[in-house]
Amino acid sequence: MENDHSSSDEHEHENPELQTRAPKRRRLSETSEDDEYVAAPTPLPTLSRIKKKEPKDENKDTSTGTDNPVLIKDALEMGLQDAGESSFKALNVAPWLIGSLTTMAVRKPTAIQRACIPEILKGRDCIGGSRTGSGKTIAFAVPILQKWAEDPFGIFAVVLTPTRELALQIYEQFKAISAPQSMKPVLITGGTDMRPQALALSQRPHVVIATPGRLADHIQTSGEDTVRGLKRVRMVVLDEADRLLAPGPGSMLPDVETCLSALPPSSERQTLLFTATVTPEVRALKSMPRASTKPPVFVTEIEAGGTTSAGADGAAPKSTLPPTLKQTYLKVPMTHREAFLHVLLSTDGNAGKPAIIFCNHTKTADLLERLLRRLAHRVTSLHSLLPQSERSSNLARFRASAARILVATDVASRGLDIPSVALVVNYDVPRNPDDYVHRVGRTARAGRRGEAVTLVGQRDVQLVLAIEERVGRQMEEWSEEGVSVEGRVVRTGVLKEVGSAKREALIEIEEGRDVLGRKRNKLKKVR
């Protein structure tokens, strides 16, 4: 490259024809000296050559790495690695995919991507566990697209995920990564008309991203012609596998089994499971009987420090939270929880932060949105009782910062990647510690800083202790310099203001009006 640069300079000085042509391009200038000085402007490629030339000339000075002062600890926390496979090229990713990822500003693979992509490309089944925000979607999307490009046909892959919003996010990522190719993904989720979805399935898209309930409906009711293409699927992904495979009330297992029954047997397809919490149900799949022709399952669990535990059969690692997350709690009386929340969101430190408030029940989320709206907060909501069109528009408003606060149930706790979120508030303490891990994972993503505040009542102490045992870290008591939440609630008119707003919100709900005061029919849950 250095020789090319020097030779181009010599050619420019030695070629008289080039020197005589250059002034003709700059007839706007009237002085010959100016023309001579700017006759050969430096093109962009020359700038890049100069940058590449510097390390060769100053090799001894730059060997210490002072140009990129990244500490080893910080690099591990970000899922980066200076030595070994620190690029997608080293993982044998196709050049067109590397270019597509670069366009998306994804230049270095994270720990879960480094561990899984080469093994998936080898054809191995995979169980991947890694903390939230670590790039699990790219870890399975890239090898799927690379293998599809080698033999594109019909429905190549099916991705199952528990929520509509996460399915939409995965669908958009597949479209973005596959932009240079003519890959056709299709989104199959509840809350929308089944007829266009059935038509799309019958036209043999390349990748199907679906929620289990809606895809099971199509398998059972849309006819053989619609789902015949599923019989040739090569790859299956269970994203948020712990939720998809969880037993008990509200389990998705029956729908997942219906979906898998329409696909080729496990011996004839590649199965990928990804989750932030590797549960016993997920880990047990490693020991299931396998065809002798298939390679062993690849199991990896990436801890928060970037270390890899491959093939582990013990308990799930506790360090599943990002190191940049600050965990705090705020003691609140059960009768004044709304007032404490209002003051917490209004402090100088929190007033400008995009925040997600998690509730255990849809009715609580609905009430909180109405109450906070009356208290002058820019707020929207996301829960299962809303029509799908409203869920999508509310989430879009929050992504675009038209609303600062999103009040949500656990439908928003998994997979949603909204980098601007700086604060997560657990209005209700989750009953399952794994749900806490997913909730607080909505902030402090990809190395950014974030805070999670849990409102703790008298009856929540045991739940908090279980959470601390699960994550291996203790929560600190919330504090902000010069702020006493309890003092502001007691000594100001907050209690009266919040009480009045709550009464108005309850009346609005009883009258069957939406958050804008418009009369509407009772909401029905759509599968």
Swiss-Prot record:
Its main location: nucleus. CDD domains: DEADc_DDX49, SF2_C_DEAD. Residues 1-16 have a biased composition (Basic and acidic residues). Residues 117-296 form the Helicase ATP-binding domain. Coiled coil: none annotated. Its EC number is 3.6.4.13. Signal peptide: none annotated. It is found in: Nucleus, Nucleolus. Residues 1-70 are annotated as: Disordered. One of its GO terms (molecular function) is ATP hydrolysis activity. ATP binds at residues 130-137. Pfam families: DEAD, Helicase_C. Keywords: ATP-binding, Helicase, Hydrolase, Nucleotide-binding, Nucleus, Ribosome biogenesis, RNA-binding, rRNA processing. Residues 324-486 form the Helicase C-terminal domain. The Q motif is unique to and characteristic of the DEAD box family of RNA helicases and controls ATP binding and hydrolysis. ATP-binding RNA helicase involved in 40S ribosomal subunit biogenesis and is required for the normal formation of 18S rRNAs through pre-rRNA processing at A0, A1 and A2 sites. Required for vegetative growth. Belongs to the DEAD box helicase family. DDX49/DBP8 subfamily. This is ATP-dependent RNA helicase dbp8. It comes from Aspergillus terreus (strain NIH 2624 / FGSC A1156). The lineage of its organism: Eukaryota, Fungi, Dikarya, Ascomycota, Pezizomycotina.
